[in-house]
Amino acid sequence: MARKCGAVKLRSCCDPLFEAPEVGRLVNLVMVSGKKTVAARIVYTALAMLSPDRRRSYELLMQALHNIKPSAEIRTRRMGGASYRVPAEICSKRRMSLALRWLKSAAMRRRERYAHVRLYNEILDALSRRGGAVRQRDEVHRLAHANRAFSHSRRG
């Protein structure tokens, strides 16, 4: 019989300005070589460009992330010597994680000179359902839809 209790969930880091875990996660994703103050300045400047009101800019960020979040993803399942790509539902925590990662990577692929302008423009594009992050989500959904014939072979 197992004697250990379940793993303790660590609280995700909330940022001091917005007191929201999503903004803290975005700051940590943008951070390069441990330079957190530089990353925080990039994220806060981009959010300030969205709206001077903090609450409104946070709501706009959350709406953009909602537009980026995927509802299904492809998992590779090996059966009978062949690998199949099986669509699977995603839990809400992973949805948010993927959305933040895709937002950051799409923003940093953009051509603007400054990082905060790139992030700002990517958030605006996500709000209007355009841009690299939304394109990536649509690609994942397209793959899941194309492979729905294998959805009967999900685990559990």
Swiss-Prot record:
Keywords: Ribonucleoprotein, Ribosomal protein, RNA-binding, rRNA-binding, tRNA-binding
Alphabetical GO biological process terms: translation
Organism domain of life: Bacteria
Ranges in coiled-coil conformation: none
Keyword Cell wall biogenesis/degradation: no
GO cellular component, one term: small ribosomal subunit
Pfam families named among the record's database cross-references: Ribosomal_S7
GO molecular function: rRNA binding; structural constituent of ribosome; tRNA binding
Quaternary structure (record): Part of the 30S ribosomal subunit. Contacts proteins S9 and S11.
HAMAP family associated with the record: Ribosomal_uS7_B (MF_00480_B)
General function of this protein: One of the primary rRNA binding proteins, it binds directly to 16S rRNA where it nucleates assembly of the head domain of the 30S subunit. Is located at the subunit interface close to the decoding center, probably blocks exit of the E-site tRNA.
Homology family: Belongs to the universal ribosomal protein uS7 family.
Protein name in UniProt: Small ribosomal subunit protein uS7
